[in-house]
Amino acid sequence: MTKSLTFILLSFHTLCCMGGNTITTAKQPTLDDLDKVISASKEYTKKYEQEVGYIKSKYVHAKSAQDKLSASRELFTKYKSFKLDSAYAYAERKLHYARILHNYEDSVYSELDIADIFNKTGIYVESYKILSGLEHKPMSADMRRYYFSLYGNLYEGLRETSITAYQRTENERRRIMFRDSLKNMKNKQSDWDKAEFLCSQNKYTDALHCLSNSFKNLSYEDRDMGYVAFSISDIYRQINETDKEKQYLIISAIADLKN
């Protein structure tokens, strides 16, 4: 469910050209709202750069491995949605300091974060090396959810790049296996996980209901707003509700610009 602002804006332009006006009720954003945010984008970019600069200063001046780990964690979070090369660099650094500190949780999360970046950039062999080298039994419930989700994403990527029908079938079988492992976990799943599973079953109405639970609790200042709105838009795309697809693309674009 990762996306770039450029993709959102290009997609939205295409939709507008395809026909129809956007919905303009009081609670729904319009193109004018998006234009206002775009005009103020320099302000948001400046704020983001200031925050990153401040954390980088903390990292440079940190004296202890614990402080280096903390700053690396913050910088990874800042970069993971926008600059994967920088996110990768700080994921490696937080893994380095976590190992020095014998911090199991940060070590595992760092390896999972690196595998996630490899998945997103199509480096599936390296992602598999990391995931297959991890033992999931000692993991916390959140770690296991992340782990199973990454394995599912890995095999989805391999399925899409398969050359033969046999490879496609086998990768799809493995994707479903990890999807089911995620679904069958006894611990409560997030609305995001539930929606992704429901979409894989073509249960789009149920998926929208799950995501609406998260959406109604978010504002434009929440980083997750962009992801949730984009996911809702993508569901509407799949069921050919173009007006609502456009509406949530605008919301996603505004949230991304503000964060």
Segments from the language model and where they lie:
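N-terminal secretory signal peptides that target proteins for export/translocation
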Residues: 1-2
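Bacterial N-terminal signal peptides
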Residues: 6-16
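A "functional boundary" signal
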Residues: 16-259
